[in-house]
Amino acid sequence: MRNSVEFSQLGLKTAFNLSQNKTYTSAVKKQFFSTGAFLSNGGNIDLNKHTQKNIDSKYVACNSRSVTPPNDVASSVSKNTLRHKQRLMMAQWLMSPEVQKAKSSSSGNVGLGPNTNQPFPLNPFFKPPRPISHSLRMKITDEYLQGASIEVLARKFNTSPQRIEALIKLRRINDEFEEKKKPILHSYNEVMEKMLNACTKPEMMQFNDGNDIPLRSNPVSLWKSLPEGETFTPQEAAKILKWPSIEELNMRQNATHFHKTSDEHKDLNEDEELISSSPSEVGKRVFRLIDLSTGNVYRRDTGGDIYVKRKKSTT
């Protein structure tokens, strides 16, 4: 039988399955009760030498309002072990002196640190993207209303097209509220922007929406929605892209080849004389050579024939 032991404290939940193997069972029990003792005693118990050795290096003084990120867990451990160590690191951080001091502080501005762009700098596990301020959102949407496309704005402000679309939707809702004279909490917005250190300038924005980077600077959208089952031929795609169709390209190529052949026949005037023919020397180009001593012009065509145009004597 496999028994399940579940423990929950300080918002941390750990589950361990105990198997029939005595060695595995004793090891898991030891790990479980060490975790429980650590949390119940306020995080002062020694978990292991490595954790105790590095616990001082994970934190700095609260006056600087900055915490060194926790040590990286080895990538070779299993997922369950990784989650367990992450929970222990979070528990250690919750029991750290700087967090306890922040909890007991009477100041309401505990989520901000001086000279930092990260909100809640005391928490090394909190790394969200910076929001966009109301003034910058209005600037972006104003350019959209003036005719700028979504992709151009995404490239200009270093963000994704999806985020620009979301800002446009928010602008529409904001305009609807103003038309209906519904109250808008501008003061709350200003407070939250200060707390989260929102971006107020375009150069402060950082792309953080995955790999969906706008690659094209073409302001014309080339997306086309089709009903299910409807065919979309290459000819229709060529019309939308304003490209010539394959038939037109073939006609142009044939016409060019015809003109080249006609030009070659024009060169076969009465002044030229066939002096040599070699089918083994067939090529793709026509060569012309001039004999500077006599002034004669030699031409070898693509079929391997060599012609000469002798210079007329001026007597």
Swiss-Prot record:
Which residues does the Swiss-Prot or TrEMBL entry list as transit peptide?
1-66
Keyword terms: Mitochondrion, Ribonucleoprotein, Ribosomal protein, Transit peptide
Q: Which GO terms describe its cellular component?
A: mitochondrial small ribosomal subunit
- Can you say where in the cell this protein is located? Mitochondrion
- Kindly give the Pfam families that the UniProt entry links to this protein: Bot1p
Quote the InterPro entries the UniProt record gives.
Ribosomal_mS45
Q: Which GO terms describe its molecular function?
A: structural constituent of ribosome
> What biological processes does GO assign it?
mitochondrial translation
Keyword Zinc-finger among UniProt keywords:
no
Instruction: Please explain the role this protein plays, according to its UniProt record.
Output: Component of the mitochondrial ribosome (mitoribosome), a dedicated translation machinery responsible for the synthesis of mitochondrial genome-encoded proteins, including at least some of the essential transmembrane subunits of the mitochondrial respiratory chain. The mitoribosomes are attached to the mitochondrial inner membrane and translation products are cotranslationally integrated into the membrane. Required for mitochondrial protein synthesis. Has a role in mitochondrial integrity and cell respiration.
Q: Which PANTHER family match?
A: 37S RIBOSOMAL PROTEIN S35, MITOCHONDRIAL, SMALL RIBOSOMAL SUBUNIT PROTEIN MS45
Please identify the protein, giving its name as recorded: Small ribosomal subunit protein mS45
Q: Could you tell me which species this protein originates from?
A: Schizosaccharomyces pombe (strain 972 / ATCC 24843) (Fission yeast)
Designated gene of the protein: bot1
